[in-house]
């Protein structure tokens, strides 16, 4: 289990650095002579969907499949298997989602049509955050990395629930019934002891199509499929084999491709009025101010009330640095922004807010942790 966790951190750290590079490349291309080609390519039709929709609806389903696998493993056999281990990350993640949402509504809630974006600043990008933390090397104790990872995993659970409940279109009964039948078939395979992966993967593909047609966002199929893939007591369970095989593809290909496809925003026609509009301000404030206030404040309160203990080997200053890093929303924030709004102008404002809040959080968190001494 320790080797699996170390491998996970290493993959997330390297993947996070590649994600940062992909986002930077997207912004450079979007503000270069290649910009028309970049945007035309993203909106080119490939069968029933555009390239951008294939990335966001199909490839990101694999990202959510991995998220589901990680959540299931952590809660059944990992660092969240005991209730005592869940208390602090759950409190921190819950407060770290509520505070940004409230701050967003304070900035943007009064503007017509913007309430739908309340969930955008609630997310934490684990790959991006771990990538920044990895740059600190030994200055970041293992307990700090574990704390950040567990918060992000619980945060992902909240994000999945929000996507399923708040951003679902009109429901198609027959397609939803088909999805339920397929999911039951996957669970049945586990009950009768099927350990080969291919039957689960075939049914997972059918589940994705059924969920897509049902009106629920197709990426939720990834999480549902993960819950049906068995995690036994053996070290080579179907879940662990799939997680191990999927991790490099998601970390080094799918998430960077998503970042490159979604982070590109042209600043040619963006002025101070758009930068200071309620939507980007609400998102940036939610990520940079709301996340740190919600997470750090709730952790201090939980420890003071005796509900949980401070992570061993980490100072309060270091925990505040982690709270800052949790304001890096990026992947999930951009994803939710695409679900909340369809107007290209609003999508650009979402990108500005997410990039602004995430960059501020990354710089502030890194700087604080970089200059933080050892715990005494």
Swiss-Prot record:
Pfam families: Na_H_antiport_1 (PF06965)
Membrane spanning residue stretches: 8-28, 49-69, 87-107, 117-137, 140-160, 162-182, 209-229, 248-268, 270-290, 321-341, 349-369
Membrane association type: Multi-pass membrane protein
GO cellular component: plasma membrane
Cellular localisation: Cell inner membrane
UniProtKB keywords: Antiport, Cell inner membrane, Cell membrane, Ion transport, Membrane, Sodium, Sodium transport, Transmembrane, Transmembrane helix, Transport
A GO molecular-function annotation: sodium:proton antiporter activity
Principal subcellular localization: membrane
Keyword RNA-binding listed: no
Catalyzed reactions per annotation: Na(+)(in) + 2 H(+)(out) = Na(+)(out) + 2 H(+)(in)
Keyword NAD included in the entry's annotation: no
InterPro entries tied to this protein: Na/H_antiporter_dom_sf, NhaA
One Gene Ontology term from the biological process aspect of the record: regulation of pH
UniProt cross-references to HAMAP family, sorted A to Z: NhaA
Function field: Na(+)/H(+) antiporter that extrudes sodium in exchange for external protons.
Family membership noted in the UniProt record: Belongs to the NhaA Na(+)/H(+) (TC 2.A.33) antiporter family.
Name of protein: Na(+)/H(+) antiporter NhaA
Species whose genome carries this gene: Rhizorhabdus wittichii (strain DSM 6014 / CCUG 31198 / JCM 15750 / NBRC 105917 / EY 4224 / RW1)
UniProt gene name: nhaA
């Amino acid at each position: 289990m320790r080797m699996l966790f170390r491998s996970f951190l290493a993959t997330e750290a390297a993947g996070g650095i590649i994600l940062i590079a992909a986002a930077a490349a997207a912004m450079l291309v979007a503000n270069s002579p290649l910009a028309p080609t970049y945007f035309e390519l993203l909106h080119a039709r490939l069968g029933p969907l555009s390239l951008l929709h294939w990335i966001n609806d199909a490839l990101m389903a694999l990202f959510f499949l991995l998220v589901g696998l990680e959540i299931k493993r952590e809660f059944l056999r990992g660092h969240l298997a005991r209730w005592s281990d869940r208390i602090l990350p759950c409190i921190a993640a819950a407060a770290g989602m509520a505070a940004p949402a409230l701050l967003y509504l304070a900035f943007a809630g009064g503007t017509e049509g913007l309430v739908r974006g309340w969930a955008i600043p609630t997310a934490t990008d684990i790959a991006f955050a771990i990538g920044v933390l990895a740059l600190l090397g030994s200055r970041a104790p293992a307990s700090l990395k574990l704390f950040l990872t567990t918060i992000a995993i619980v945060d992902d659970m909240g994000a999945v629930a929000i996507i399923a409940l708040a951003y679902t279109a009109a429901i198609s009964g027959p397609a939803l019934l088909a999805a339920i039948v397929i999911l039951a078939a996957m669970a049945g395979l586990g009950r009768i002891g099927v350990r080969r992966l291919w039957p689960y993967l075939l049914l997972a593909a059918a589940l994705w199509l059924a969920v897509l047609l049902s009106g629920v966002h197709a990426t939720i199929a990834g999480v549902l499929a993960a819950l049906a893939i068995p995690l036994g007591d053996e070290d080579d369970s179907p879940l662990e084999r799939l997680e191990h095989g999927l991790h490099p593809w998601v970390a080094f290909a799918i998430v960077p491709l998503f970042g490159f496809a979604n982070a590109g925003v042209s600043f040619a026609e963006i002025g101070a009025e758009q930068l200071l509009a309620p939507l980007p301000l609400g998102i940036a404030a939610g990520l940079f101010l709301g996340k740190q206030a919600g997470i750090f404040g709730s952790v201090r309160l939980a420890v003071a009330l005796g509900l949980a203990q401070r992570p061993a080997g980490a100072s309060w200053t270091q925990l505040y640095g982690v709270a800052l890093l949790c304001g890096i929303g990026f992947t999930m924030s951009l994803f939710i922004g695409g679900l909340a709004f369809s107007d290209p102008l609003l999508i650009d404002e979402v990108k500005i807010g997410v990039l602004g809040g995430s960059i501020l959080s990354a710089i502030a968190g890194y700087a604080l942790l970089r200059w933080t001494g050892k715990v005494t």
